């Protein structure tokens, strides 16, 4: 296995380029399966989740050509050769469940997908997916290893109202509605930028699809789609991540391709605690405008609110901001466990089951912590950390970059590879001191100060 040793290095300075959005690229690859024509995607990020989705599409009959230097990928699926997703894709991420919507139009006789995985940040149940698909004429059954869906009478358009604006359920229903007979109106949809990117892709390919400001998507089923050439939008989570790393280190980093319109709630919160930024046509420069001051309430929400994926790295900023701040996580019920790692480094954090904000969320009666108070500013100390999920991983790297007392040992760095293109190289280019090592599991029981590390990065 690979681990990272990250040293406190002082200020980060320089420039990095934001890659294409993970949460758009993976979904557009699945959407390409709606068409039997060639689809070209540009600005494709070279990350683990995209590679995995490419292999998933290939297993179903897709022909894929991916030039990683130019970031251009061509995918062509003239016919679906397999309607049972191989079990090797079980529990690795949440992409396979979207194949129900994408494939049923071309394979109404039935599709089988294995159980889904992804970050360990809560139950993330599939009820919204299944209930919506059933309203389109889909019959669904399940066993311990996966889900079987079929549409024996074909997909039929319908009026669907989602109980919650779930991103995944919105995507699945859009994909299914493309091949459904008649009109489908989906209410209370998620309207994240990646959803709109999916809509643009489908419209270019020939779909009759529109959106409205009242969280409505309207689709007339058109059957098969044509060829399409589409450039993936930049990753707003990666852009914010490097912006936060710059601010917490006291440095100055220009994040090329960062888009202000994708970052509005993040930039507002960043400025409120003392972070600075300068917006230009080609990107955003991030820096620390004044000593960081807390006393804020950070509440995650669906778009256009503060994204849950920004919350974890932002907690590191709050640990270095003078005063007490509140985090209220309303999107995923189990996304604050990473704070134990920051506590181990010296951060002062308290977890609460109550909703610590002006409004109660859907987890108000849940028996689990989904709010936290962070008291800053406190020095952080190098520690041995195990990454629990992708965004917590970047938070741990940020914390290690400002920690005192040597290098932090960080396990499960493969989770960072899922969502950040060349994260080690990009951080090194800004002055970060990071080494990647191969290590046997039993060696990790040794104190980080006495580890016999074998460098695999040279």
From Swiss-Prot:
Its EC number is 2.5.1.7. One of its GO terms (biological process) is peptidoglycan biosynthetic process. Keywords: Cell cycle, Cell division, Cell shape, Cell wall biogenesis/degradation, Cytoplasm, Peptidoglycan synthesis, Transferase. One of its GO terms (molecular function) is UDP-N-acetylglucosamine 1-carboxyvinyltransferase activity. It is an enzyme of class 2 (transferase). It is found in: Cytoplasm. It catalyses: phosphoenolpyruvate + UDP-N-acetyl-alpha-D-glucosamine = UDP-N-acetyl-3-O-(1-carboxyvinyl)-alpha-D-glucosamine + phosphate. Its main location: cytoplasm. UDP-N-acetyl-alpha-D-glucosamine binds at residues 94, 309, 331. InterPro entries: Enolpyruvate_Tfrase_dom, Enolpyruvate_Tfrase_sf, MurA_subfamily, RNA3'P_cycl/enolpyr_Trfase_a/b, UDP_GlcNAc_COvinyl_MurA. It holds the Pfam family EPSP_synthase. The active site is at 119 (proton donor). Phosphoenolpyruvate binds at residues 22-23. Pathway: Cell wall biogenesis; peptidoglycan biosynthesis. GO terms for cellular component: cytoplasm. Belongs to the EPSP synthase family. MurA subfamily. Cell wall formation. Adds enolpyruvyl to UDP-N-acetylglucosamine. This is UDP-N-acetylglucosamine 1-carboxyvinyltransferase. The gene is murA.
């Amino acid at each position: 296995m690979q681990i990272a040793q990250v040293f406190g290095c002082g200020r980060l300075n320089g420039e990095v380029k934001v890659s294409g959005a993970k949460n758009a690229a993976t979904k557009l690859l699945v959407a390409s399966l709606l068409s039997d024509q060639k689809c070209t995607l540009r600005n494709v990020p070279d990350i683990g989740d995209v590679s995995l989705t490419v292999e998933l599409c290939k297993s179903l009959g897709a022909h894929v050509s991916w030039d990683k230097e130019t970031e251009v990928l061509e995918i062509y699926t003239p016919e679906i050769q397999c309607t049972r997703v191989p079990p090797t894709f079980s529990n690795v991420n949440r992409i396979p469940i979207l194949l129900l919507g994408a494939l049923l139009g071309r394979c109404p006789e039935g599709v089988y997908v294995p159980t889904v995985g992804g970050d360990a940040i809560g139950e993330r149940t599939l009820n919204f997916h299944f209930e919506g698909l059933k309203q389109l004429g889909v019959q669904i059954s399940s066993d311990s290893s996966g889900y079987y869906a079929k549409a024996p009478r074909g997909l039929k358009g319908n009026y669907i109202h989602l109980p919650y604006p779930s991103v995944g359920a919105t995507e699945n229903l859009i994909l299914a509605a493309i091949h459904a007979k008649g009109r489908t109106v989906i209410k209370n949809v998620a309207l994240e930028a990646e959803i709109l990117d999916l809509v643009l892709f489908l419209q270019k390919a020939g779909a009759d699809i529109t959106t409205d400001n009242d969280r409505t998507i309207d689709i007339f089923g058109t059957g098969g789609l044509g060829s399409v050439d589409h450039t993936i939008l930049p990753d707003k989570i990666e852009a914010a991540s490097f912006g936060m790393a710059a601010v917490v280190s006291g440095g100055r980093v220009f994040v090329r391709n960062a888009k202000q319109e994708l970052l509005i709630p993040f930039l507002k919160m960043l400025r409120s605690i003392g972070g600075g930024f300068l917006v230009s046509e080609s990107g955003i420069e991030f820096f620390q405008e004044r000593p960081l001051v807390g006393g804020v309430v950070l509440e995650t929400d669906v778009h256009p609110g503060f994204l849950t994926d920004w919350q974890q790295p932002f907690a590191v900023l709050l640990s270095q901001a003078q005063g007490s701040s509140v985090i209220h996580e309303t999107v995923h019920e189990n996304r604050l466990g990473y704070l134990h790692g920051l506590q181990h480094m010296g951060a002062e954090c308290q977890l609460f089951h109550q909703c610590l904000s002006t409004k109660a969320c859907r987890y108000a009666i849940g028996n689990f912590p989904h709010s936290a108070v962070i008291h800053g500013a406190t020095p952080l100390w190098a520690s041995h950390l195990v990454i629990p999920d992708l965004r917590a991983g970047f938070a741990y790297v940020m914390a290690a970059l400002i920690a005192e007392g040597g290098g932090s040992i960080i396990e499960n760095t493969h989770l960072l590879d899922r969502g950040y293109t060349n994260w080690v190289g990009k951080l090194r280019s800004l002055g970060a001191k990071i080494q990647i090592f191969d290590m046997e599991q039993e060696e990790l029981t040794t104190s980080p100060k006495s580890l016999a590390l074998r460098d695999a990065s040279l």
